[in-house]
Swiss-Prot record:
GO molecular function, one term: DNA-directed DNA polymerase activity
Annotated InterPro entries: DNA_pol3_alpha_NTPase_dom (IPR011708), DNA_pol3_finger (IPR040982), DnaE2 (IPR023073), DnaE2/DnaE/PolC (IPR004805), DNAPol_HHH (IPR029460), NA-bd_OB_tRNA (IPR004365), PHP_dom (IPR004013), Pol/His_phosphatase_N (IPR003141)
Recorded family membership: Belongs to the DNA polymerase type-C family. DnaE2 subfamily.
Disulfide-linked positions: none
Gene: dnaE2
Protein name: Error-prone DNA polymerase
Free-text function comment from the UniProt entry: DNA polymerase involved in damage-induced mutagenesis and translesion synthesis (TLS). It is not the major replicative DNA polymerase.
The keyword Nucleotidyltransferase belongs to this UniProt entry's keyword annotation: yes
Compartments, record wording: Cytoplasm
Gene Ontology biological process terms in this record: DNA repair; DNA replication
Superkingdom of the organism of origin: Bacteria
UniProt keyword Protein transport, yes or no: no
Protein source organism: Allorhizobium ampelinum (strain ATCC BAA-846 / DSM 112012 / S4)
Keyword set, alphabetical order: Cytoplasm, DNA damage, DNA repair, DNA replication, DNA-directed DNA polymerase, Nucleotidyltransferase, Transferase
Length: 1097
């Protein structure tokens, strides 16, 4: 018997389904099920994944959706044709618009309005009066397309229930159909389904009760089993295929139409595009258009015309033109930088002719895929661009793509552990030991946490967390991928409101959009463009230079000298540990060297074994051999090594006779060969083509294996060139205007690889004076202040650095300051009108010290005398005057001042950095007694020397291409040190590596030229050494212990024999939990003030 399962829920019914579409379709194929009806709840979010699973397995997909109505009815709806699908998409959009994010509010009347062409199956519970009313309504709304589901509930009298439902359906002339209400593909997923139910209901497995499924039968069954379970309802079983035949709609029928763009009156989109291209040519080529470039432009315009992509190019041109008119810095990147048309229109900044790029990497007639132009904008002003797009195209025709937020290791551990009732501290210990979402949950990791790996609930947590990894958690918002349409967008896909105001998103992500060949425009945010925009503004204001990206001096020697020394902290793209390690070896001296530098520290070139051959050839340690002049023409710039995706494509085209489209298909097949194996069909063509053109079989095989090794991660040369432009510009500014660069970078946070503490530390190391936050001099942003009568400038930290302070209060402070500086805390409070809580935040940041010379505790004491409550009119002045007199008559209080160490802790806790001594400086005497050297001593030691050094952990990085190697950067008062932790040591000391704030490392120095690393052999967690830091001054005596007991107090307290007698007038201020209500307590343990290390995965 042929059978289709029409009620299947995938894991895109978030936290309901426990299996993916591909798992369900593969299982259906193995069981002999003809078709699957995917009916995720109130959503079509997973339907494209189901389409791809259907394509892969050959099992027919019936597009559907389960609608849960406000009156309690649940109806499975299936569009029978294309217009019915559009009505379904609009119906879901209507419900999402009413319900907001993650909710859908629909009534039966809505279905009646949009229901033409929809087939409906009522999902009943009992054959009662409610069901009778619902059946009558179903017959009225759906007519001949109305059905009633017969589904086992595995409860007492189940067969009687089915019999009554069948009779009731006959009475209302509604046909019955068998469904199985599938939630997972095989019985083993039952436990995971229970867990996601607990997560959804925010409860535990012990208390979830009847919210969980009452039976384990919610998996796919073969037709024979369904026939055995429903022996009396064979006609209802056969109707499953009847419904499949009636629902002829396929997602393949969706035809996407890009909106018409004809900016020039009375011209078509193609004519408008050509008009603007030739109009912009003199701006890019004032000396005249080179003949080769003219040929490239004509070739591109011809291909754009054939593929009907002119409206897309005009849209991107319009967006970029709007941004430039508003002074918003922007630049195109990605494969679009291969296009001469994009370059001439100002969308990208890379001349394809000069850089010998490849247009087929961007647009190919054989590939027949929509182009993809990524444009980066200043991240603080991108919203202006997004709202312009909505206003220009209309919200009914424009929306952002979704992103699928999936479970990773830590999130899976947390949610599963909570669902299974594990204690919070145990969940935290387990999740903190996870680095990435790979299978890092071995018994060894559990034992390292002193846990019992044989504990059943703990073992089950790890097993179920592994099953949950990769499952979708909810839909998020794409950073800027817009889908624009000619007609209504909700005819193609449901739209829902975003959590962000004035935004809306479709239910599909970029992969879904690409699978259906929709075109999208990527309006992305780049923090470094914000930084560079602020750099240029500060240079114009303080240096008198009118600088921009196009006017920066090219091939500046001083800039490249700085880059070669890996002095690139805070710059773009070449600031990571791996990039810094490569810079002294590659020694970039030209712009193209920088393009190579950006691209070479990537998984692709590393896995393809291309990095070391390139470096050896660059250092003249290995000869470069080109078997033919054609290969030299292709790979000459990269010394015979195909570092870029375009290089691989050119090798295929020039050496093996591939067309441009075939070469791009080769690139795509290499990118997915691990999953599809499609690369094998190109191997024979490439190898035989190269042999036919005179290459040896051995060389051809070697070439293919290299391309295969890096294809899945290869970097486009056009993309690298676009990023190299910004990388060079940021390094140029850092080299020649370090004060400006520091201020702009701080004003653009959060962004980049390093925290403000490291940015400020690096600026000071370059001779930049950095001044603290000041209530009388700081604005919201960091500013530049002239140093005396010189042309030098110091950086004044802005109030944006103060944690907990809002921009509105800062604006009031700055406005009040226009009438003169504040001379006291009370004066500032009266004139600015900011609440006392904001003054407390400024006091914690020590912002009163620079101009008013008031210490933190003195300010906090003064703030306690202020009143936020408004006083009655007329009585206000008199009452305030009396209070002031009383306060003036109050005896002066001498507060015990904070230690230097406590001030450092407070600095880190409230502004994220300190301009005082480094925290490790307070521990140096103790560390020296343990033979722990400074980071500077370690990094200047000879090669092979064994040392032990310690510092605060700044950055942890574990690149996917590094084969499990962990790179750590630590810092002490002398500077940073670079640590390499091999996989064996990482697994052995995982808790220390991932959990410590301060670490000591014993290891051996490794030098390769100017690149220095400390190869770790032993690791020690010194975080506890920081706990008493707040009690210390630079000169202090370590507490002396007496055996196993403490001397009259808490750990970390001083030796009572060294204490001086108390002064008679010392006032001890009571400790208060709420910071804004009292003075800082004397810390017995250090608060978690230091910024957490930045982890890069």
């Amino acid at each position: 018997m042929r059978y289709a399962e029409l009620q299947v829920t995938t894991h895109f019914s978030f936290l309901r389904g426990a299996s993916s579409a591909i798992e369900l379709f593969e299982t259906a194929k193995s069981l002999g099920i003809d078709a699957i009806g995917v009916v995720d709840r109130n959503s079509l979010a997973g339907i494209v994944r189901a389409l791809e699973a259907s394509r892969a397995t050959g099992v027919r997909l019936v597009v559907g959706c389960r609608l849960d109505l406000q009156d309690g009815m649940s109806i499975l709806v299936y569009p029978t044709d294309r217009t019915a699908y559009s009505r379904l998409a609009r119906l879901i959009t209507l419900g999402k618009g009413r319900g907001g994010k993650d909710n859908c509010i629909l009534m039966l009347d809505d279905i009646a309005q949009y229901g033409e062409g929809l087939l409906g199956i009522l999902v009943p519970d009992l054959a009662d009066d409610t069901c009778a009313v619902q059946l009558r309504k179903m017959a009225e709304v759906f007519g001949d397309l109305a059905y009633l589901s017969l589904c086992l509930r595995r409860r007492p009298n189940d067969q009687l229930r089915l019999h009554e439902l069948s009779n009731m359906a006959t009475r209302f002339k509604v046909k019955t159909v068998v469904t199985n209400d599938v939630l997972f593909h095989e019985p083993g997923r039952r436990q995971l389904q229970d867990i996601v139910t607990c997560i959804r209901n925010n409860t535990t497995i012990d208390t979830v009760g009847f919210e969980r499924e009452r039976h384990a039968d919610r998996y796919l069954k073969p037709p024979e089993e369904m026939e055995r379970l429903f022996p009396r309802y064979r006609q209802a079983l056969r109707r499953t295929m009847e419904i499949v035949d009636r629902c002829k709609f396929s997602l393949e029928e969706l035809t996407y139409q890009y909106p018409e763009e004809a900016i020039v009156p009375r011209k078509t989109a193609q004519e408008s595009l050509e008009h603007y291209v030739w109009q912009c040519v003199p701006d890019r080529y004032p000396q005249g258009l080179p003949p080769k470039t003219l040929q490239i432009i004509r070739h591109e315009l011809d291909l754009i015309h054939k593929m009907k992509y002119a409206p897309y190019f005009l849209t991107v041109f319009s967006i970029v033109r709007f941004a430039r008119a508003k002074g918003i810095l922007c630049q195109g990147r990605g494969s679009a930088a291969n296009s001469a048309v994009c370059y001439i229109l100002g969308v990208t900044s890379i001349d394809p002719e000069t850089n010998n790029l490849l247009f087929e990497r961007f647009v190919s007639q054989e590939r027949d895929e929509p182009p993809d132009i990524d444009v980066d904008f200043e991240h603080e002003r991108r919203e202006e661009v997004i709202q312009w797009i909505y206003k220009t195209y209309g919200k009914e025709k424009a929306a952002l793509c979704a992103t699928v937020n999936r479970y990773r290791a830590k999130g899976a551990i947390r949610d599963v552990g909570k669902a299974l009732g594990l204690p919070e501290d145990l969940i935290k210990a387990l999740s903190s030991g996870m680095w990435s979402w790979s299978q890092e949950t071995s018994d060894r990791n559990v034992r390292e946490l002193n846990l019992n790996p044989d504990d059943r609930r703990l073992t089950l947590t790890l097993q179920l967390a592994q099953q949950l990894m990769g499952a979708p958690r909810h839909l998020g918002q794409h950073p800027g991928g817009f889908v624009l349409t000619h007609d209504r967008l909700d005819d193609l896909v449901p739209i829902e409101p975003s959590t962000m105001e004035d935004r809306q998103i479709i239910e599909w992500d970029k992969d879904d959009v690409e699978a259906l060949k929709f075109m999208k425009v990527d309006v992305l945010a780049l923090g470094m463009l914000t930084c560079m925009s602020k750099v240029f503004a500060l240079i114009r204001e303080h240096k008198g230079d009118d600088l921009d990206l196009a006017k920066i001096r090219q091939e500046d020697k001083a800039t490249y000298e700085m880059i070669c020394k890996a002095d690139t902290l805070g710059t773009f793209q070449i600031e990571s540990r791996a990039q810094m390690a490569m810079l002294p070896r590659l020694k970039p001296k030209t712009f193209y060297d920088l393009v190579v530098q950006v691209a070479i520290v990537r998984p692709g070139p590393i896995q393809g074994d291309m990095v070391h051959p390139y470096l050896r050839r660059r250092e003249k340690k290995e000869d470069v051999d080109y078997p033919t002049p054609e290969l030299e023409a292709v790979l000459g710039k990269t010394l015979g090594v195909p570092l870029f995706q375009e290089s691989a494509m050119r090798v295929a085209m020039v050496c093996a006779g591939f067309t441009g489209g075939e070469a791009d298909q080769l690139r795509k097949s290499m990118a997915t060969f691990k999953f599809t194996g499609g690369v094998s069909r190109f191997k024979e063509k490439l190898v035989s083509g190269m042999v036919k053109n005179g290459y040896t079989p051995e060389f051809a095989e070697k070439t293919f294996s290299r391309l295969e090794g890096f294809g899945s991660y290869g970097f486009p040369e056009s993309h690298a060139a676009s990023f190299a432009l910004i990388a060079y510009a940021s390094n140029y500014v850092k080299c020649h205007f370090p004060d400006v660069f520091c201020a702009a970078l701080l004003n653009s946070q959060p962004m980049g690889f390093y925290a403000p503490a490291q940015i400020v530390g690096d600026a000071r190391a370059h001779g930049v004076e950095v001044r603290p936050v000041c209530v009388n001099r700081s604005r919201w942003d960091c500013t530049l202040e002239r140093i005396g009568t010189t042309q030098q400038h110091a950086v004044r930290l802005g109030m944006r650095m103060v944690k907990g302070l809002v921009v509105a209060d800062v604006a009031r402070i700055v406005a009040a300051r226009m009438n003169g500086p504040f001379d006291s805390v009370d004066d500032m409070w009266r004139r600015s009108g900011v609440p006392a809580a904001s003054l407390v935040e400024l006091a914690h940041a020590d912002a009163f010290q620079p101009s008013l010379k008031l210490a933190r505790r003195d300010v906090l004491w003064a703030i306690k005398a202020l009143r936020d409550e408004p006083l009655p009119l007329f009585a206000a002045a008199a009452e305030r005057e009396m209070k002031t007199i009383a306060e003036q008559n109050e005896p002066e209080v001498e507060l015990r001042q904070m230690t230097k160490g406590h001030n450092v802790v407070e600095d880190y806790g409230h502004i994220g950095l300190t301009l005082r001594d480094h925290p490790i400086a307070f521990l140096r005497t103790d560390l020296a007694k343990r033979n722990i050297v400074t980071c500077e001593e370690a990094m200047t030691a000879r090669d092979g020397r064994w040392v032990i050094t310690a510092g605060l952990v700044l950055v942890r990085q574990k690149p996917g291409s590094a084969k499990g190697v962990m790179f750590i950067t630590i810092e002490d008062e002398t500077g940073p040190a670079n640590i390499v932790v091999w996989p064996k040591l990482f697994e052995k000391r995982r808790r220390i590596v991932l959990g410590s704030s301060m670490m000591a490392i014993h290891g051996r120095i490794q030098r390769e030229g100017e690149v220095v690393h400390l190869i770790a052999q032993q690791l020690f967690d010194l975080t506890s050494d920081l706990s008493g830091l707040a009690d210390r001054d630079m000169e202090f005596k370590l507490p002396t212990g007496r055996g196993d007991e403490f001397a009259h107090g808490s750990p970390g307290g001083g030796d009572s024999r060294d204490r001086s007698p108390p002064k008679p007038r010392d006032i001890v201020v009571p400790l208060c939990r709420a910071r804004h209500k009292g003075i800082d307590p004397e810390p017995e343990t250090m608060p978690s003030a230091f910024p957490k290390p930045r982890d890069f995965r």
